[in-house]
Amino acid sequence: MTIADVAAEAGLSKTAVSMILNERTGTGLSQETAKRVREIAKRLDYRPDPSARALRIGTTPTIGFVSDDVTLTRYASAMIRGILDVAEENEHTVLLAETGHHPERLSGALNAMLDRRVSALVFGSMAARRVELPQLPSDVPVIMVNATTFVDYPVVLPDERTAGEAIARLLIDAGHREIALIGRRYDEDLPPEVSVTISDRFAGLDAVMEEHGLEWAWEEAFDYWAPDDGYRAAKRALSSGARFTAMVCLTDNVSFGAYQALQEAGIRIPDQVSIASFDDDEISTYLRPQLTTARLPYEEMGRTAMSLALDGNRGTDRHLVPMPIIRRGSIRSR
């Protein structure tokens, strides 16, 4: 049914019916008449034409979400769930597009969404890094989630510094003073195209160690945070003769490798060495003992980004989302 059908049955003009159904003031009609029009529209199963609405107001109740590879990774469900939940709560729909790190796909996806008159755009990345976006219209709000760009759009990122502080403090409060750090990356080796947040993670760890007058008992840097890297680094830490009762691994994947090296050497976790990590990857629950880790808050970042998009936020603020510490069995008090 069309608005003309509703108007004909109500005995009113299409303009008057449109104003009532769009809850606009100034119709000059009584509340009883407005109620009757809504009842007729419901009975006739009238649905507004989104294309007509878009032509009238310039946008649709639709948000565009474009990512580099979020939808193809294990992190997809949490971030997208957060985005979709907030959109649904506010009666909006979401268009999803994946670029696979191809610049030509990125431009095409963004243009396609702009052609559909989305009311805002959200760009998301699996790794918190700087990305290059094409020039976008100034009248469309753009929100960056787990990513930054060269334009000062609102940014939603995990609060890595506070998480680093919390992990270091957790081990120190448990009585550990000799702590190894596995997976260091230095700023000069960590361009923003790789990460814009990991340096904050190190800063938080280092700040708490310094606050307590402590130095790392063993420290090793490497370029990738894969299980093999964690395994080899932990083996070298053990063979170095360094004394440590706890270990911080920069990711759960690194922790997985460190677990293997320690357990091969007959070292019991956490009885002899406690381990804490970051990310809360699925693997953290399969390790034995289960791994204590700081969770990357993908769902909450998605929710925050969508809320900003719905608000039409055009500021330049950086919104930091807390990383909760998930306490499991890999830390023992001394």
Model-derived features: where do they sit?
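N-terminal helix-turn-helix DNA-binding module of bacterial transcription factors
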Residues: 1-61
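Alpha-helical recognition/docking segments in bacterial nutrient-uptake
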Residues: 2, 57-169, 173
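Short acidic/polar active-site loop segments enriched in Thr and Asp
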Residues: 13, 61, 119, 177-178, ...
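Short amphipathic alpha-helical segment that frequently serves as the phosphate-/nucleotide-binding helix
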Residues: 34, 77-81, 202
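Bacterial carbohydrate/catabolite-sensing allosteric modules
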Residues: 43, 85-90, 138-144, 148-334
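Short gly/ser/thr-rich secondary-structure transition/capping motifs
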Residues: 43-49, 104, 123-126, 231, ...
